[in-house]
């Protein structure tokens, strides 16, 4: 990423400060769930450090593996702990729940409207003299990204939603016992 020097410096300072704040949150917060979310902030900031050095695949892999898998497992383990002392003042529906449900519902309906109307094959195919040809100069990493963002995009997202629903269901069942 060829950024001007001041923007590059601001980006690095903001990522570093996010890393420090997240690390302090992991250590200083008494609620283990908040501490796990702070570790997620730390992992996101670490993965974003790779972007200014043009290591996009490493950044994406770090986000998928550490934030998407490891941090979810940490949150899953924290949810199994006996957290009754943290939830003494349980409210059934709060303002934050309403705001979150409105945001999630609007994102869901915008995705439902956008996905069928998007030409996914138009992302990678180029047109030259009325022939549609695939770009020949792609590496294996680019081919993986191309196939994940075109051919396997919808199955990839459906699997992630199924895994998320099963995780939430397992947490809900473990909470009842």
From Swiss-Prot:
Its main location: plastid. InterPro entries: NAD(P)H-Q_Oxidoreduct_6, NADH_UbQ/plastoQ_OxRdtase_su6, Nuo/plastoQ_OxRdtase_6_NuoJ. It holds the Pfam family Oxidored_q3. It is an enzyme of class 7 (translocase). GO terms for molecular function: NADH dehydrogenase (ubiquinone) activity; quinone binding. It catalyses: a plastoquinone + NADH + (n+1) H(+)(in) = a plastoquinol + NAD(+) + n H(+)(out); a plastoquinone + NADPH + (n+1) H(+)(in) = a plastoquinol + NADP(+) + n H(+)(out). The keyword Membrane applies. Keywords: Chloroplast, Membrane, NAD, NADP, Plastid, Plastoquinone, Quinone, Thylakoid, Translocase, Transmembrane, Transmembrane helix, Transport. It is found in: Plastid, Chloroplast thylakoid membrane. Its EC number is 7.1.1.-. It is a multi-pass membrane protein. The chain crosses the membrane at residues 10-30, 32-52, 61-81, 92-112, 152-172. It comes from the Eukaryota. GO terms for cellular component: chloroplast thylakoid membrane. NDH shuttles electrons from NAD(P)H:plastoquinone, via FMN and iron-sulfur (Fe-S) centers, to quinones in the photosynthetic chain and possibly in a chloroplast respiratory chain. The immediate electron acceptor for the enzyme in this species is believed to be plastoquinone. Couples the redox reaction to proton translocation, and thus conserves the redox energy in a proton gradient. Belongs to the complex I subunit 6 family. NDH is composed of at least 16 different subunits, 5 of which are encoded in the nucleus. This is NAD(P)H-quinone oxidoreductase subunit 6, chloroplastic. The lineage of its organism: Eukaryota, Viridiplantae, Streptophyta, Embryophyta, Tracheophyta. The gene is ndhG.
């Amino acid at each position: 990423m060829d950024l001007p020097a001041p923007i590059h410096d601001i980006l690095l300072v903001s990522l570093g400060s996010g890393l420090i704040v997240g690390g302090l949150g992991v250590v200083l917060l008494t609620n283990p769930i908040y501490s796990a979310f702070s570790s997620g902030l730390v992992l996101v900031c670490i993965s974003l450090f790779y972007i200014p050095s043009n290591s996009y695949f490493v950044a994406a892999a770090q986000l998928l593996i550490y934030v998407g898998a490891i941090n979810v497992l940490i949150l899953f383990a924290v949810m199994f702990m006996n957290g009754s002392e943290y939830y003494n003042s349980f409210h059934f529906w709060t303002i934050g729940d309403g705001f979150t449900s409105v945001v999630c519902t609007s994102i869901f309906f915008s995705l439902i409207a956008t996905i069928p109307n998007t030409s996914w094959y138009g992302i990678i195919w180029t047109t030259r003299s009325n022939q549609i040809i695939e770009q020949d100069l792609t590496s294996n990493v680019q081919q993986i990204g191309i196939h994940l963002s075109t051919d396997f995009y919808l199955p990839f997202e459906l699997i992630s939603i199924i895994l998320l629903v099963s995780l939430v269901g397992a947490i809900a069942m473990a909470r009842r016992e």
